[in-house]
Amino acid sequence: MSRPVRFAALAAVLAAFAAAPAGADNAPSGACLGDPSANGVPMAPGPRLRFGITPAGEAGALGPAVPVVPDDPPRTLAALARLHPPKTPLVLRLNRFFWADGEAGIARFLALAKRYTDAGYLVELQVRYHPAAGQEGNVAGFVAFVREVVDRFGPNSRVVGLQITNEVNFTISPDSSDGAYTGARDALIAGVIAAKDETRRRGFRQLTVGFNWFYRTDPNSEAGFWGYLRDHGGPTFVAAVDWVGLDAYPGTVFPPVEAPGGERDGMVAAISQLRKCFMPIAGLGAGVPIHVEENGWPTGPSRAEDSQAQALETMVRAVHDFRGTYGVTDYRWFDLRDHNTSSTNFQHHYGLLRDDYSPKPAFETYRRLLDDLALRQPDAGLGPVRLALRLRYGRGWCAPVRATVTGADRPLVRRLDVSVGMRRLARIRRSPLAFTIRRRGLSPRHRYRLRVRATLAGGRATTLARRLRACAR
């Protein structure tokens, strides 16, 4: 729910939703609530969470249009750098990537992905169905768009996730959620299958594929949604799903109000209902991880900034504490910066920063939580580094050797440390990633190893090595 546009529309029906049981005819064993409270739920251990955030400030909202305060890229990167612990992967979730925007949208998101991955972050894309006039219901057209997204973004090894469609179970808010459009369920199924097929075919091993679920609508609608995935997706769909995303906003959307600290129960209820009640309907078992793709708490009129910090800490620690219990591997906060801090509509105040980039108390809270709880493997999920060391020997006796670093990850290289045997030769920090080695003085009696230590954006590193031929006598 990265766009709080749905809040007012939900207000009229939330009371009915809250009163109804969360299971339905297609639930595994009748009515299914999951775990409504954290009390008594075991906190099983699990790997540390991979954290992230939505860096954009734009948020849709019901009511009069309020202009978004434009993003300032250098200040955004500076804020992210303050938030980001060293040697820790931080995933930036880029939302509102609409099929309707065509090539212009692809170009814009390619530029955003490059900006953030060049700075050392991982990127995840929310690939929206959101059709233009004349596209609605054209599932084959959306599938072609999804395949193109894979082909265009997959070569960037730091683009690690594609969320196909957005909140298809939510059907009354076309700006925020794809469920309002004809063919959305089929677009989800076919899009996930196509995205996974294309990543496998192209060998983009780092690129995972998932879809998300909005917590929550009425139980009958939820059972119908998950039953549709089962009946129309089947084993092919299940095999293509790497993860299922959860969008949950306790104290803002559902439930619309929580007492301070009650957000812990809200997160447990949302995660457990997804894991225990709904994923099994579609055949998505315990081996499919859950990503908390969107979780937030806005400030604004009657919503204090200190309360945001408290809610953030409560919700993050709940996900951390029960990650092993429910198989949660990832967490994303929505979002970094306010849409417009001068707006009287609280829906424009989701950020950890105000629109002038000054921090709210929650910024420091999230920074501290990342430092305490985040996964410490900067290369987690990325697969092997795609670099190679090429040598070209010059003509003539004892001619120099030209060495070049090549490969798909070459744009991510930040430094090369070059050595021959025990002797350090050079440190290279700029393109071209090439250097010349003079072989005079290398004894033909010895074997020499050329080693190049490549350090990449984000802290990853690898060593490339080749045997170096000495000059013949």
Q: Predicted segment positions?
A:
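Hydrophobic faces of well-ordered beta-strands that scaffold small-molecule active sites
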Residues: L49-P55, L90-L94, V123-L125, V160-I164, ...
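Bacterial N-terminal signal peptides
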Residues: A8-A19
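Active-site cleft segment of glycoside hydrolase catalytic domains centered on the general acid/base Glu
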Residues: V69, P73, E103-R108, P131-S272, ...
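Aromatic-rich peripheral "rim/lid" segments of glycoside hydrolase catalytic domains that contact
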Residues: A31-P42, A65-L77, V168, S302-S307, ...
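Boundary/entry segment of secreted carbohydrate-active catalytic domains
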Residues: D25-F98
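Catalytic-core region of carbohydrate-active enzymes that cleave or remodel glycosidic bonds
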Residues: M267-T329
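Long, low-complexity serine/threonine/glycine- and acidic-rich segments characteristic of extracellular
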Residues: L387-R395, V401-R473
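Acidic (Asp/Glu)-rich catalytic clusters
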Residues: M43, T76-K87, A107-V123, V149-S157, ...
